[in-house]
C-alpha cells in the first residue's frame, strides 16, 4: 500500500508534466502580416449583393393584409402548393388543414395585446393528417374544405409533434369575394 501511495505522489510532482503545454502568451499582432488593399471604389467589384439591394422593390405595406408565411407573394398555384406540402412532409411535420370564415388575417378584436381571440386560431378541418406521405392527400382535403365552405380562408400548417410547435403555416385558398385592399 505504501508503494502505491509513493508512486502516485511521484507522478503528480513530476516536472515533465508541468512543461507539456506552453503557457498562453497573448494574441499576435496583425501588424506583422503583409496586407495589400485594392484601392478601387467601384461597387461592381464588391463580392456581396449590397449595391444591388437598393434597386429591389418590396411589397407595398399600405392597404395589404398580412396573412401567414409567404403572404407577400401572389396566390400559390396547385403545383406550388404541392411543393410546399412536400417540403412540410420531408421535414417530418404533420400537415393540418384549417379554415376561417370571417377573418383570414391577424386582427385585434378584444384589446390591442396578443391573445386567444386575435385571429391566430382557426377552426381545424377534420383531424391532422398523421401518417400522411403524399401532398395529394393534403390538397384533396383542401378541395373538400373549399366545397364545404367556399367563402372561407383555408390554410395549411405543419406541426412538429416532437417539439410540439407549429413550424409552417401558409394560405392555401382565399375566397373569391376577398380583396387585398
Swiss-Prot record:
Residues 1-54 form a transit peptide. It is found in: Plastid, Chloroplast. One of its GO terms (biological process) is reductive pentose-phosphate cycle. One of its GO terms (molecular function) is mRNA binding. Keywords: Calvin cycle, Carbon dioxide fixation, Chloroplast, Photorespiration, Photosynthesis, Plastid, Transit peptide. The keyword Transit peptide applies. It comes from the Eukaryota. One of its GO terms (cellular component) is chloroplast. It holds the Pfam family RbcS. Heterohexadecamer of 8 large and 8 small subunits. Interacts with RBCX2. There are four genes coding for RBS in Arabidopsis thaliana. Belongs to the RuBisCO small chain family. RuBisCO catalyzes two reactions: the carboxylation of D-ribulose 1,5-bisphosphate, the primary event in carbon dioxide fixation, as well as the oxidative fragmentation of the pentose substrate. Both reactions occur simultaneously and in competition at the same active site. Although the small subunit is not catalytic it is essential for maximal activity. This is Ribulose bisphosphate carboxylase small subunit 1B, chloroplastic. The gene is RBCS-1B.
